[in-house]
Amino acid sequence: MQKKYVVALDQGTTSSRAIVFDHDANIVSVSQREFTQLYPNPGWVEHDPMEIWASQSSVLIEVLARAGIHSDEVAAIGITNQRETTVIWEKATGKPIYNAIVWQCRRSSEICEQLKAQGLEEYVRENTGLLLDPYFSGTKIKWILDNVPNARAQAERGELLFGTIDTWLVWKLTEGKVHVTDPTNAARTLLFNIHSLTWDNKLLEALNIPLSLLPEVKPSCSVYGTTRIAGEGSEIQVAGMAGDQQAALFGQLCVEPGMAKNTYGTGCFLLMNTGTKAVRSNHGLLTTVAVGPKGEVNYALEGSVFMGGATIQWLRDELGLIRDASDTEYFASKVADTNGVYLVPAFVGLGAPYWDPNARGAIFGLTRGANRNHIIRAALESIAYQSKDLLDAMTKDSGVSLKRLKVDGGAVANDFLMQFQADITDVEVLRPSVCETTALGAAFLAGLAVGFWESVIELEHKACIDKHFIPNIDAETRVRLYAGWQDAVARTRA
């Protein structure tokens, strides 16, 4: 039977999805299932790894059944995943010894402080590109080994395996035959040397983590094993995987140095490909691993802001100013400007490039003439201002002045936000026709790995732009508006 499709498994923080793409990179079928969020203590976040697998395997079966696609027609399955989330399971039984500790979980803060006290902060920064923060997997692994009864003894005997979610899914898909990760996910563990592309012995020793626990690191664009859908039909190759933000970067075909994308979700993630050079940030960004045009390792600068779409949710759920996120464009467009109002959504502090956990949200510039439309417009503009903060930091670090920014995520449907993003950055903003770029990136990697597509050049002919947003304000206005934003941010940090 002819191979007509590639399936992307998109395992996210709140739901598992499966998306079928055809040879023209069009979406054929989508299936999605949410799963339980667990909050056992303040600041702790967990998932049940078996529920993640149950939700992911069920949507894989469902997405094919819904479109009437036979497993023989599927060329490959690609994987993209929430990064950093940590699972440890028994090699012999496949049973997790503890819930997955989610990237948002802060329980390992004390371990990070211990590493800082040991003088490891600069070593971590130089060799992993990351900050010493509970966000990343390494300290989560140590917490499990230290706190789950018998875990450390089992680990020392080589009876346990660790994986981020990509590794866990491949292990389950291949029925325990393959224990593997890719460089983009390995680079988020705090244990991976991004220069030698190997696990870092000094950090493993500092965290007391046995090497036997860790998966083999294989290229993002390669075949890892095979699986059968529900144990039936012919075997399908499991091929191609990347962490969610790197998958989106590849899905946008940002495979050359200086190309960048911004994902507008709950927060915003801006990544710029820096090619074969790992650029160290001096402006609050992370250095991470990306995927090059032939599936090889490239590097990227990454900046994240905590409050993107979450700011709009706040307008809806807490203030009641809108009924639906899509209402914001209508209200923002009813006024010519914000009437001097700036909203700084530092509800949980500020992310990159400030990294200020003590900053708090505020609305500045309120006068008697300020109304709902001005506040809604200021909320939308805050998303673009924060993205400009990241873009300016990237320009300083990389020496590359960006001319075009590719965008994806739910908020890119908002034309007002996209136009203001172009205006305030003085950069052309490109919105793709297929906004599911994270899943598309996983599909591209899988398809390239098995020869479903020949090269990135072929893929470029399939990537269509829905709309170009061209900067449309003068330099003087741009400088004045951004100066107002910078002043507002400074006051939230005072």
Curated annotation (Swiss-Prot):
Coiled coil: none annotated. SUPFAM superfamilies: Actin-like ATPase domain. Keywords: ATP-binding, Glycerol metabolism, Kinase, Nucleotide-binding, Transferase. Gene3D superfamilies: 3.30.420.40. Transmembrane segments: none annotated. Glycerol binds at residues 83-84, 135, 244-245. GO terms for molecular function: ATP binding; glycerol kinase activity. It comes from the Bacteria. Its EC number is 2.7.1.30. Pathway: Polyol metabolism; glycerol degradation via glycerol kinase pathway; sn-glycerol 3-phosphate from glycerol: step 1/1. InterPro entries: ATPase_NBD, Carb_kinase_FGGY, Carb_kinase_FGGY_CS, FGGY_C, FGGY_N, Glycerol_kin. Sn-glycerol 3-phosphate binds at residues 13, 83-84, 135, 244. GO terms for biological process: glycerol catabolic process; glycerol metabolic process; glycerol-3-phosphate metabolic process. ADP binds at residues 13, 17, 266, 309, 410, 414. ATP binds at residues 13-15, 266, 309, 313, 410. This is Glycerol kinase.
